[in-house]
Amino acid sequence: MAATIGQKPYEEGFRLVIAHIDCPRLDLRPNPLYESDHMSYFRTHYYGGIRKYQWATIPLAIHGVFTRADGSSVNFAIGEDENDPVFCITDLLPHLGAEQNARPLKDGIKAEELNLLIGSDAVDDENVKEAVKLNTMILLNEKYGITEKEFMRAEICLLYTSDAAD
């Protein structure tokens, strides 16, 4: 916030200048984690500026902060360190996406399809219904000490990650 304070009282009038920036981004929804087709995903909220299809198949990192019930917080970033996994939003191969190919360009990938692939390894237990989702949550808990309920008190976004190149 910036302000210039004038000489006259505000009752005599003032000028107000307001601005904002467009910051294209994907944030995670409050309950983002789900399993589909033996893969775990995060559901996202899309905030505009760039076309939705430009988010697909690019390397993404996850940045955020979890606020625990006791008020403490955990900051984290996954995907920036060279030993971290790098994430992406999947897309169909052209020869498999006939329905998608028939859509106009602006609808090539819909906002509700911008889901981040987060895991593919399952817990080794045939009795577990969502074994990949459970394993993803176990890994997040072991590394960051977070639980699924804490996503409700989290601010998490997806950012493009790649080294600059000529």
Language model regions located:
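Structured, contiguous alpha/beta core segments that scaffold functional sites
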Residues: 90-91, 97-112, 165
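A non-catalytic alpha/beta surface segment that caps or lines the substrate-entry region
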Residues: 1-4, 149
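Non-transmembrane, aqueous-exposed alpha-helical and coiled segments at domain scale
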Residues: 6-13
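Glycine-rich, flexible beta-strand/loop modules in the N-terminal catalytic cores of phosphate-handling
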Residues: 36, 84, 103-138, 144
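A generic, well-ordered mixed alpha/beta core segment in the N-terminal half of proteins
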Residues: 13-98
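Flexible, glycine/charged-enriched surface loops at secondary-structure junctions
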Residues: 145-156
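Conserved small/polar residues in nucleotide/adenosyl-binding loops
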Residues: 160-166
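Aromatic- and glycine-enriched pocket-lining scaffold segments that form the walls
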Residues: 140, 157
